[in-house]
Design a protein with these regions (language model features):
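Predominantly soluble domains enriched in secretory-pathway, periplasmic, or organellar proteins
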Residues: 22-458
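C-terminal motif of bacterial Sec signal peptides marking the signal peptidase cleavage site
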Residues: 17-20
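Bacterial N-terminal signal peptides that target proteins for export
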Residues: 1-8
């Protein structure tokens, strides 16, 4: 397709990344020296702990220049998502988990640096996907996928909702119930008129045998630059490549390639687009630790049904999670991955596919940061730091030494190290909401548990 080839050639000049998983999220980088070199931007992050009984959560929004210069002194706008949902006549959310911007005004060189009009919020405890207008901060659409389209199946576990580059659809990764397979849902999107229509569900249990797992549970995904395919990571390992079909669902989603767990081991996590039709994902070891990997897939042959095995890079540390890309002063591409359990950051040379440096984030002002979802702009990397009592994924790992909030790392020009100081930590601690803590539960601690994060280009 000519449009696809055009995007592929142009993307060789720029960098588009995402993090994510539990976080999947798209993140981007340029070779500039700092975040302020780009157009106006904000940093959005969600605290998935409830604000009303078991529902709600908080959305934090920082001015990009303010949080980059002195995160500790930057004043965020804070939105109670239970109140915002009520004002929009939407159901109260539970565990707001992932925030990802759309791509409404495509820049032919790099759609990730196009102005976004909306942020898409996946709520992993209630089955809701929210559409939030960036300028008004209002929820302008909500789609609940419980039960699936025409009863095809769907649970409350809406893990990630990702907008296509052409703005025509959002695909939702629904993990499914514990011990059961999950689903992919499609929402047709019209951001101009705030019209969001649930049009399709694809049950994934039929692919468990090919994956080599007992169930097929999708975690995160992202689209190829032409919006024709989605690469979907899986909780038990393996990966699905999906032809996404048409935005109205008349041409359904179809799985065109299954990578099994032998080829792609590890708990699936974030997905990121790289230049030259490459897709980057990771395989994590989770709370228990083990082997962790970074993968790069060549998606250039997807339209012709050609799918090579990925490059597999083993990572030191435990529980790879946030993964972004960085371009050094010579134009070389690197991956930067945060290791959630071991608190490390790995720097990977994507020319040689080797880990070239590992650096710990643990410091005297953040003893156990637990870095999770990340995004990058220029040489500023923003990372959500988990709470004392995590509500998702690493709930067994409680610690009083956490600093829930957003870390702002300044990445070196050679993309091989970072610097961060106490002023580079934007706190999301909420003293008004506490939970019992300790062996007896006799003490309390802040309930805050940050997770989703996105750099939003305005």
């Amino acid at each position: 397709m000519n449009v696809r080839l055009l995007f592929g050639l142009m993307l060789m000049l720029v960098l588009i990344t995402a993090v994510a998983c539990e976080d999947s999220k798209s993140a981007s980088s340029t070779g500039s020296s700092g975040a302020s070199s780009s157009s106006s931007f904000e940093v959005w992050a969600v605290d998935q702990s409830p604000t009303s009984a078991e529902h709600g959560g908080l959305l934090y929004i920082w001015d990009g220049d303010d949080i980059s210069e002195n995160a500790s002194q930057a004043t965020p706008e804070i939105i109670d998502l239970a109140v915002a949902a009520s004002n929009a006549n939407c159901p109260a959310p539970k565990k707001p988990h992932m925030v990802l911007a759309n791509h409404t005004s495509n820049n032919p060189l790099d759609f990730r640096f196009s102005r976004a009009s909306h942020v898409v919020l996946a709520n992993v405890g209630s089955g809701d996907t929210f559409f939030i207008n960036i300028d008004s901060r209002s929820i302008v659409g909500c789609v609940n996928t419980l039960g699936g389209f025409n009863g095809a199946g769907g649970t409350a576990n809406t893990h990630a909702a990702t907008a296509s580059p052409d703005s025509s659809m959002v695909i939702v990764a629904n993990i499914g119930a514990k011990g059961e397979s999950g689903f992919l849902h499609k929402i047709q999107t019209d951001y101009t008129n705030d019209d969001y229509t649930f049009v399709e569900t694809l049950p994934l249990d039929q692919f468990s045998n090919a994956l080599g797992t007992s169930v097929a549970r999708p975690i995160c995904h992202d689209f190829t630059a032409d919006s024709e395919f989605a690469y979907v990571t899986m909780a038990g390992g393996g990966l699905l490549v999906v032809d996404v079909g048409s935005d109205d669902g008349t041409t359904p989603m179809t799985v065109v390639k299954v990578y099994d767990t032998e080829t792609v081991p590890g708990i699936g996590c974030g997905v990121a687009r790289l230049p030259n039709d490459k897709i980057m994902t990771n395989g994590e070891s989770g709370a228990k630790g083990g082997d962790d990997f970074l993968y790069t897939f060549d998606a250039s042959g997807a339209e012709d049904g050609e799918f090579e095995n990925p490059v597999k890079i083993e990572l030191p540390g435990e529980d790879t999670h946030g993964a972004v890309a960085c371009t050094d002063q010579d134009g070389n591409l690197f991956a930067i991955t945060s290791m959630r359990v071991s608190n490390d950051v790995n720097f990977v040379d994507l020319q040689t596919n080797k880990v070239v440096a590992t650096q710990s984030m643990a410091t005297n002002f953040s003893l156990d940061p637990k870095p999770d979802v990340a995004d990058i702009l220029g040489k500023k990397m923003f990372i959500a730091l988990r709470g004392h009592k995590p509500l998702t994924a690493i709930g067994s790992l409680e610690s009083a030494d956490r600093t829930p909030g957003v870390a702002v790392l300044t990445i070196s020009d050679d993309c091989k190290s970072f610097n961060w100081e106490a002023k580079d930590l934007a706190s999301m601690t909420d003293s008004g909401r506490t939970v019992p803590f300790g062996l007896t539960g006799g003490s309390v601690i802040t309930a805050a548990d940050p997770h989703g994060l996105e750099v939003v280009i305005k």
